[in-house]
Amino acid sequence: GSVSSARIAAEELAEKYPDNKVLVVDSLGASSGYGLFMDKLADLRDEGKSIEEVRDFAEANRLHLHHWFFSTDLTFYVRGGRISKAAGWFGTALKICPLLNMDDEGHLIPRQKIRGKKAVIQQIVKEMENHAQGGHDYNGKCFISMSACMDDARAVADLVEEKFPHLNGKVMINNIGTTIGSHT
């Protein structure tokens, strides 16, 4: 996977540029989770932390980053074998939106089945309320990833910005990309 490729690249770069350091950390994350994590690590670098201190912070804090996902379309869950055709049909008829997150090993785990887009948007923000450092006083950054659903992403971002008035800037919305989109 990505971490193995990064380790191979680090070894090749170490041979070619022996005076430079490349350290690899498995963030156990994905998509904008990587981006948010790297943004924090760049801040530490800019504060004058050594590469080893940044790596140590990354390893100690990688599980503090929360990834929550939802989908309003069950088609690809059926095609990917995650749910049966019957479950997909009934879930679609009942407007079920699965809410998932990532466990401590980076695997996607279904957590809840929620009826309706509005309800799942409310719940995903409640999850941020439950997990954000400092609760509603959270003053870090927030990234949202989406795939062809800008209106839904904007609805989540607006609610996050309303509930967390001390965010460091506006919520950043990004596309998840085809690899992550097809995997989930």
Regions found by a protein language model. Name each.
Residues 2-23, 29-39, 43-184:
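Mixed-charge interfacial surface used for oligomerization/domain docking
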